[in-house]
Regions:
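A conserved segment at the C-terminal end of the G1
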Residues: 1
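Nucleotide-activated chemistry modules centered on ATP-dependent adenylation/adenylyltransferase
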Residues: 50-62, 69-146
Length: 146
């Protein structure tokens, strides 16, 4: 954001809890956003996913690929519409390995307006996170990253 001359608060981080989202995941997201001084919001997608599963006849007790992919696709819908509403763009988190090997949900987490990690193999992601943790501005940010 510095290179764009924009405040970090112009970044809107979105957490979208649903089935299986833990308190730790939510807490780490909040801490990360606070430490980086980016805006943070929550969109609880559980009701939307329940409605979607009802529409398609998906039994929520069947933890299959439809159960997993349905959540990813709802998240992408929410992100794309939030980006449209706010004049932003969706920055994807998928890496080169996930994209090359198909370890992403079509019309789900493989879609974004900018795939910042699209050229980064999974084997390098851990090293990049470690590097950022090593230069982190605070001990709390370092803790969350590691």
């Amino acid at each position: 954001m510095k290179q764009l001359g924009r405040p970090t608060s112009d970044v809107l981080a979105v957490t979208m809890p649903c089935f299986g989202t833990t308190r730790r995941t939510r807490s780490n997201a909040e801490i990360l956003c606070d430490e980086l001084a980016v805006s943070f919001t929550e969109i609880d997608i559980a009701n939307t996913v329940h409605s979607h599963f009802k529409d398609i006849g998906q039994d929520e007790q069947v933890l299959d690929v439809t159960f997993e992919n349905g959540q990813a696709r709802v998240r992408t819908l929410e992100l794309m519409d939030t980006a449209n509403r706010t004049g932003g763009l969706v920055v994807g988190t998928g890496d080169l390995s996930e994209l090359a090997l198909g370890w992403a949900t079509y019309n789900g987490d493989h879609m974004s307006m900018y795939g910042v990690n699209a050229g980064v193999p999974k084997t390098l992601v851990r090293h990049l996170v470690r590097y950022e943790a090593d230069i982190a501005a605070s001990a709390e940010l370092r803790r969350v990253l590691l």
